[in-house]
Amino acid sequence: RIVKLGDDMISLAADEDGQFSHIGIVVRKGNDWMVVHAVPGEPEFKGDSDRVKMEPITSFFCSEKAKSGAVMRVKADSTVCCSAARRAKALYHKRVLFDHTYDLQDSTRMYCTELIEYVYRLEKVDISGGKLTAIHIPGFNGNFLLPGDMFQSKKLTMIYQY
């Protein structure tokens, strides 16, 4: 699992106490390390939808997108983590759309933390422990699962942070 801090004003406003504003899962594609994540506003081609995407880890962490970042490992058997990564890749291949309503109850569309929580819950691992953050900003009210909520999870071990 990877987290990063970008400069998205909505993410920073929503997660002002959090250290990170985005999250993805590391997967292997041939000999390359990639990150699968759900993201709006980063089309790969003209007319591309906001959706789950897969990109090289270097692109995910490039300075234009990330001011800081971390690589964390889920405290689970490696077969569980590999299966979660395969599930994330499958969502990418299905071209699952980005969830602009941030609805955790609807898995037909995904936002970044929802994607990670979803693939690990299918493996019977509850990373967030049900932790949600209450957000009350104009036009955006409710309880949401933010990267900062997951960053605090006892089920994660820090591997590297910058």
Predicted segments, located by residue:
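Sec-exported extracytoplasmic/periplasmic mature domains
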Residues: 28, 40, 76, 89-93, ...
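Residue-level detector of flexible, active-site-proximal loop/helix-junction positions
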Residues: 42, 78, 134
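Membrane-interfacial terminal anchoring regions of lipid-handling membrane enzymes
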Residues: 81, 91, 95-96
